[in-house]
Every structure is written in C-alpha cells, then in structure tokens.
Amino acid sequence: MKLFLLVMAGLAVSGGEWSKPAEIVVDDTVCATYRARVDDGGHLVIALTLADGWHTFAMDNQIRANEKLAGKKALGMDKPTSFVVSGGLTVDGPWMQPALLDFSKPELRIFSWGFEKQASFAAKVKRTGTAARVGIRAQACTETICKDINTSLDLDLALAAGPVEPGLSALTPIRAQ
C-alpha cells in the first residue's frame, strides 16, 4: 500500500503536471503565480494567475505601443512579459498569448495591453535534454504600484508530458518587429 501511495504521489508531480509555482509577493500578498509544463502536443505552456486588482502586460506590449505612438515619445511605458527558455528545451515556433485587455491612456500618451486574473502563454518546443529552465521577466501592477518580476521555473523533462492543454486554439501569435 505504501508503495502504491508513493507511485501515485510521483505521478501527481510528473512532467505532465505543472512545475513548482513561482510566487511573486508584494506586502505579504501573492500578486502573481507562474507555473509551466510541456504537453503531449509539444507545447511549453506557462500559466499565470493574478490576484484581484493586479494586471500584467503583453509580450508584444512595446511593439503595440510604438505603433500607436507613431514616432512620438511615450510619457510612460509598461514592461512587456518575456520568457527565456534554456536547458533541455528549445523554442520551435512563435510565442502565443491570450486576447488582450487595453490599459491605454491615450490622453497621456501611454499605450499598454495585458491581462487580469489568468493568462496562458505557449510556444512549440523541442526537447533536447532532461531538464529545462524558463526565465520570466515581467511587470505586475495595480492602479497605484508596480512590481518588477524576475524569476524562473524549473521543469523535469525526463517525466512524461501531460495531455494537450485545452484552450491553446484561443491563443494568438505575438506581434514581431
């Protein structure tokens, strides 16, 4: 019986399951939580959960803002979300992100798009080893404060991939320069 429970516990944290979460804390409150996994479809999926009142920004936020500014100087710029994949994974396709919310304040020449509550990001990947790291840089904000995010997630690729992530078809490719 003990062996059965140990095997089941091991399956619960397998490569098909989510990585250990990276929690971003501001004033004793977890404002953002990131997790990652690789699915059977060969996608690296990164899930973001935000606390009420917090939001973060699109991967292509700067490109979108520059388009709206049309050469004018911005009075403020929110930091885009970015991921750096290293170790036993290589990105083999465009990054995808969900539909965006518009946080822009055109009267102040501030243009920004992003996410509230939850967001998933995905990219097709190739396995090249048994462990990988996903570096995360972003910014999470409320109406009054912002927190720079610089964290990482570790993935054990020696374990089986999980089922294809539902909802990937709703994601769209990020804009490129």
Q: For the regions a protein language model found, what residue spans apply to each?
A:
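Sec-dependent N-terminal signal peptides
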Residues: K2-A12
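Extracellular/lumen-exposed scaffold segments
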Residues: G15-Q177
